[in-house]
């Protein structure tokens, strides 16, 4: 939802715009599901929103980066959502049942988002040279955020999320699963992955890669990313613009 607040102009047809709008609608629905779980734990939704726009609450690293071209739309829907679904599937066996239940719906819908992203990418890499270059340029910018996506290589027995069975997969295992599934597909399309050190070690069955800059990840998720302030400013503006709806619909907000 956050990523698409400033949508780039469509480069294919109205169908692309409709598909992207449907994806955004799904993402809004996912946010609603998660807010309901948080409310059940005792934190009001209004407080969640206040914490978000004040900068108190953190949000995922990928939402701190700008969406510049239609190439970004494809890379986000195909690769960022692919990385996300790896993490989300690790939550299907979450020890907190209400959270595990909503993840079933979220995973099902995210699988369609990946197909949408793949279609966008296929159309562009088989289109004009300019379209191909837009995809490559977007991949170049998004690769490090993708490598940051699953977090640092903390041992599973030291990860509270794993110890408490919130998730069922260690960070590095999730990253390796993503690389296993998508590096071959990226290369098959003729795209170049911007990491000369990336290679598959046949002996270990693991991917080797340039160590991501974890200091940058920490900086980004604490509100210092390329589009962090823009995202929060837009949220504040949106909150102000719809405040009258709350006053009309909710007596306690009046």
Stretches found by the model and what they are:
Residues 1, 31, 35, 114, ...:
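A structural signal for well-ordered alpha-helices, especially hydrophobic packing surfaces
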Residues 23-52, 118-122:
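Conserved alpha-helical segments that form or flank metal/cofactor-binding pockets of metalloenzymes
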Residues 9-30, 53, 107-112:
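Long, hydrophobic, well-ordered secondary-structure blocks that form the structural core
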């Amino acid at each position: 939802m956050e990523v698409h607040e400033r949508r780039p102009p469509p480069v294919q047809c109205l169908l692309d715009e409709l598909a992207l709008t449907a994806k955004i609608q799904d993402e809004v629905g996912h946010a609603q599901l998660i807010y309901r779980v948080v409310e059940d734990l005792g934190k009001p939704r209004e407080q969640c929103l206040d914490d978000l726009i004040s900068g108190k609450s953190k949000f995922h690293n990928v939402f701190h980066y700008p969406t510049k071209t239609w190439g970004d739309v494809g890379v986000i829907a195909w690769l960022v959502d692919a990385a996300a679904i790896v993490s989300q599937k690790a939550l299907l066996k979450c020890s907190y049942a209400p959270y595990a239940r909503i993840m079933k719906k979220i995973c099902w819908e995210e699988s369609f988002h990946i197909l949408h992203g793949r279609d966008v990418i296929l159309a562009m890499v088989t289109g004009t040279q300019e379209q191909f270059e837009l995809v490559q340029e977007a991949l170049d910018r998004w690769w490090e955020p993708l490598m940051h996506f699953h977090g640092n290589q903390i041992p599973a027995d030291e990860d509270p999320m794993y110890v408490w069975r919130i998730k069922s997969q260690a960070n590095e295992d999730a990253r390796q699963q993503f690389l296993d599934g998508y590096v071959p597909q990226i290369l098959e399309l003729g795209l170049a992955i911007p990491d000369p050190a990336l290679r598959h070690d046949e002996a270990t069955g693991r991917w080797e890669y340039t160590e991501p800059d974890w200091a940058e990840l920490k900086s980004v998720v604490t509100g210092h990313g390329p589009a962090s302030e823009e995202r929060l400013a837009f949220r504040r503006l949106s909150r102000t613009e719809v405040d009258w709806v709350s006053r009309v619909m909710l007596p306690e907000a009046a």
